[in-house]
Amino acid sequence: MSLLWVFYQNNVQKLNLSNLPSSHPVTIGPDVKDSVTISTIPFNSGVISLKRKESGGQYEVFLGNDCLGTIETDISFTLQTDQQDIRLILTGSEPEKSVYFTGNRDEIVCSSEKTNADIYLNPQDFAFAEQSTFSLLRAGGSWSVRPESGTIFLNGEKINANTPLKPGDEIFWNFTQMRVTEQDLLEIVHYAQFETALTETVKPSTEMQKKYPQYRRTPRMVYDLPDDRVSFSFPSQESDQTNRGLWLVILPPLVMLIVMGVVAIIQPRGIFILVSLAMFMMTLITSTVQYFRDKNQRKKREEKRERVYKLYLDNKRKELQALAEKQKQVLEFHFPSFEQMKYLTSEISDRIWEKSLESKDYLQLRLGTGTVPSSYEINMSGGDLANRDIDDLMEKSQHMQRVYKDIRNAPVTVDLAEGPMGLVGKSQIVKNEIHQLIGQLSFFNSYHDLRFVFIFHEEEYKDWEWMKWLPQFQMPHIYAKGFIYNEQTRDQLLSSLYELIRERDLEDDKEKLQFKPHFVFVITNQQLISEHVILEYLEGQHEHLGISTIVAAETKESLSENITTLVRYINEHEGDILIQKKKAVRIPFRLDHHQREDNERFSRTLRTLNHQVGITNSIPETVSFLELFHAKEVKEIGIQQRWLTSESSKSLSVPIGYKGKDDIVYLNLHEKAHGPHGLLAGTTGSGKSEFLQTYILSLAVHFHPHEAAFLLIDYKGGGMAQPFRNIPHLLGTITNIEGSKNFSMRALASIKSELKKRQRLFDQYQVNHINDYTKLYKQGKAEVAMPHLFLISDEFAELKSEEPDFIRELVSAARIGRSLGVHLILATQKPGGIIDDQIWSNSRFKVALKVQDATDSKEILKNSDAANITVTGRGYLQVGNNEVYELFQSAWSGAPYLEEVYGTEDEIAIVTDTGLIPLSEVDTEDNAKKDVQTEIEAVVDEIERIQDEMGIEKLPSPWLPPLAERIPRTLFPSNEKDHFHFAYVDEPDLQRQAPIAYKMMEDGNIGIFGSSGYGKSIAAATFLMSFADVYTPEELHVYIFDFGNGTLLPLAKLPHTADYFLMDQSRKIEKFMIRIKEEIDRRKRLFREKEISHIKMYNALSEEELPFIFITIDNFDIVKDEMHELESEFVQLSRDGQSLGIYFMLTATRVNAVRQSLLNNLKTKIVHYLMDQSEGYSIYGRPKFNLEPIPGRVIIQKEELYFAQMFLPVDADDDIGMFNELKSDVQKLQGRFASMEQPAPIPMLPESLSTRELSIRFKLERKPLSVPIGLHEETVSPVYFDLGKHKHCLILGQTQRGKTNVLKVMLEHLIDDETEMIGLFDSIDRGLSHYAKESDVSYLETKEDIEQWIETAEDIFKTREAMYVEAVRQGDAQNLRFSQVVLMIDGITRFQQTIDTRIQDRLANFMKSYAHLGFSFIPGGNHSEFSKGYDSLTTEMKQIRHAILLMKKSEQNVIPLPYQRQEPEIQPGFGYVVENGKEQKVQIPLCSAERESAR
């Protein structure tokens, strides 16, 4: 063992280097994180560090970054820093440990000199030993150490005077460590051999150590503080002292004597003078003598007074000293330092956890040592100080009172039970003291009574990590440590703690109750919980709820006003109490010395202790299931043999536990024994669920599956049935883990159906009891097995409170079913107020495990015995009126099976402060057994094996599980046409669950109703996807009106979907109605021709089958509220379309959103959950099951009512996954039907249209003189203006309405159509100027340009006229074709202003005379520009009846058109093409400005 000894400033510390990794640096500095902490030296030059050399046991010594040298084993190394010497010694030898018996010795002398030494250590035997001597003294049962010479250390500090020893104190002398234990044993750890007169012995083991790790409290030694009353008497009054001096006594007679002498000289009188002189002389002498005599007597009296009172004070001093020492000893005993507690813990002292919640001091803490008030009383008896002087004796008396009024160097304590406590000071000091405070509470208070919750900064985790081993940090209600250091741990722990405390707060008479465990919250990070609701309890006075709070901060301003006790830490050695009981005080104290190194060992030791509570007796505390059968392996039970030999008709007795060491307790539910029905009660942690599992397993082991079976009622899905899920005896688990409103109805329907089934079998075989039927079955006369059915309900109290009718009917059914072999066991945590007369009268046996209080015990047993049970699994069995009343220990089926197992780990997990985090699973070899297998698992495996071996078939279960919430339609595919599974029906009264199909031609239109979010749209998608899987796009056309939230959007790309409509596509919907009406008329005509009335017959007879048309409207509420006209059309559509193969499916959030006339046309109605349930009654009346707020849960009304769960269109875990899967399935269908013709969509104009897009997308026909103007608004087909037929065209429109764009569109085509000549007159903004560069275009700017163009055109026309006349003469005029000569004008007014009358006349003549020769006149302008004027050109233009209108028809009078009411505005890009008084609304393409880019 390698130890480093550090000597400095009359102190010594040691560090075990063997426990440190070789690469770990050893540091000596002022910080607590250093390996050795020396807080009294600032280390301004840097900390001292030791680095191990690669070879040997040498260390290099550094001061800061400077290497000072090398330290070797058994060689001293001294260095200096901050003018302080520090001596380092490295020892490498292994120390020896010896124990010696001190006997009756009151003094043990330890010395390096052999004379009179009880322990002699020769300094020459150890290199670092020196001449020194000290004595161990025993007085009054306590030891002390008295140094006499040399250096002696106590707990690492040098001592110079006699010092009392406390438990765990360690004496260091010449590298020998000594410790007094057990009052008469001396432990010595030494490196050098020594001689001693003491007897060596072996340290005996205490009872606590022998029973370790089991720990049980012993009677606590409680010492009272001395409360004597010490009265001080006044000293006798000091005698009055005259102030007259000697001169004042002799002066009067002396003066008289002198006067008489003078008189005698002046006037002699003879004898008179002599007499007077004698008298005055005598007076003088006697006065002097009397003065000295009185003075001597006063001195003697005063000496006596002082001697007597000093003796009195000395006695009082002894009395007070004894009281003071006693008080200090009591305080030291009850409030030892944390270091002493660590020592006591290492010795497994019986003082561990000696306090309980009933102790008055259970939350008192030691802060350190200081001056405390005496517990005894000191006063002065009688007398009035006002009437006497304070003399020296009085002052001594008062001084003694002042000295003993306070006890110095005594433990200073605070009581956390008084209210929240605040700690302020430097963070490092406060944290260091928190270690001690938590350690004290952990030592004295058991984890049964006290739990910690520590809220700190995450970066400080390493500082507090040792505390996680303290059992008090394990939360009682969850598997987590009481460490809160980030948002995750805060959210995981504080919410549940808040609920727990709130439950306490809501308890009646909470002020009188004592809650367990008591929670101590230690908070160093207030910010983390600053907004949490638990602060309402932590910041207030709530100790009666079992919570206390310690808050640490750097200043008191950071604390709340609710602090009851405030402790300030001034520095590393001093502190004071500023507030106590909410009153300002100032109580200084010195901090206890504390070493953190042993903290983790302390906490781990406490963690290993198993604190036992209660009294043991002969009943075993634990019994495994296999022990009931005296078996070590499951094969030894003989299950198969028991099945073959057991007879349930005679007895149902099975073992459930032990009532003595070898006395087994049996429970027999035969009606002639303990049965048929009973009750079980046990609070949380009592072993109630384990008892039920043991009883179920015991029945399964004893009886054949055809003789005993179970139906478990696990209302909240607690997992009681989980271990038995595969055994043949379990017929089902009735659970309501989903919170179904139909739980009671479904469960009762299942149970009643089972009773009816049994009654039918009894009638069939003419028996009236289960025992008779069992005999017939065993004889082979009855074919159907009928086992005893055990109905076992766990947590029936909660079930009764939420489903009272169900429990009442269940008990009634069990009463009726007793002869049918039905047994009922009701289990609850809290029987108080739950067991009514009906339950009690039908329960013959009762099992009471540990219950919460006497009231619960009396409720089930009629006595309070069960309230006193403390052992898990312990309980009372009571049958009838105490016919049987036994205390027993139930067997534990969850015990590990075969403790001597082998194999590998099957699970690896990280143990965190908040629980277990699984990392991986490792498969074990086939021949290796799982070391985590329990007895119940082993027995269940054996039962399954025997079942397979015997070929036993599991009986059908009367209980069908609740419908799943997500069922994909792919589980029940629809392979037939006109037969589509769309939902899964639940019929518990028939014990049947099966898919239900929709037959299109029989079930007709579909109405789907339900509130938002419950699956209407998804149901519609299910239908459509089912249709698409079976029908081809040629057989089925789908129209989707998606007025909802877009759920059906992925189906818009189905190959079967003709079109997809949104709410704002009114024009598209209008076109659809036109199309569908035309289709209805067409189909009616075809049916009349075939003389048939239904599509089924038509498709059977006709060679060309008609496709089914399925119209789907999602969110019909919109139609009802905003599309009134469309609603009437849909009503007609639903009425007329069904027989024609046109079907209708709608969804709505309210039934009232659908008109009754339409509702009557919906043969199939599907109702999801409705917020107003009464709406559904108009469709299906009063159902036997209530609709639950579960998406997809529906009531289907066809020829009957069905309760069902709708299928999902795809298999997905959530809505996002479903959306993606739906798109994927649609893509697959697109690929599948890619080669087939898909239904034509409703033609709609594009949002924007260019001339390029018009020519490419719509495949324009190339016809001579036919100019494509745009797309027809209705048919979305190209509309042409035939210049060969109509010759001239007006372009009418207001400013900025697109006239120039129309001219561009016409120019583009005319230029490409090889027009012979185009005259182009532009508007003022020159919008057509870029056409001037075209070879066929003459850009006309001036009057002269126009005249020249007219001259050229006239020459052409004269030539053509001659040709035309010649062709007429020859009869070939119809075959004569001329290329077009076009005059286009953008802005007719500006054109009229440019030309004169002569040009007007010539152009008017062109229009009249040359139109047949290829002249076309295309002017553009405002309609008013064409209607004004009477010149020849204007007159001729007024005759034109062909135009392109870019305005409302009613706003112009140039071309007469029919009047249209409420004519809509013409939007930009739209216009009318008018030919001979008939208009077509068209979308006009936008022509690009640069023609070159388009070429």
UniProtKB/Swiss-Prot annotation:
GO terms for molecular function: ATP binding; DNA binding. Its main location: membrane. CDD domains: FHA. PROSITE patterns: FTSK. The chain crosses the membrane at residues 246-266, 270-290. This is ESX secretion system protein YukB. The gene is yukB. ATP binds at residues 682-689, 1010-1017. Belongs to the EssC family. GO terms for cellular component: plasma membrane. InterPro entries: Firmicutes_EssC_C, Firmicutes_EssC_N, FtsK/SpoIIIE/SftA, FtsK_dom, P-loop_NTPase. Keywords: ATP-binding, Cell membrane, Membrane, Nucleotide-binding, Repeat, Transmembrane, Transmembrane helix. It is a multi-pass membrane protein. Residues 661-858, 993-1177 form the FtsK domain. It is found in: Cell membrane.
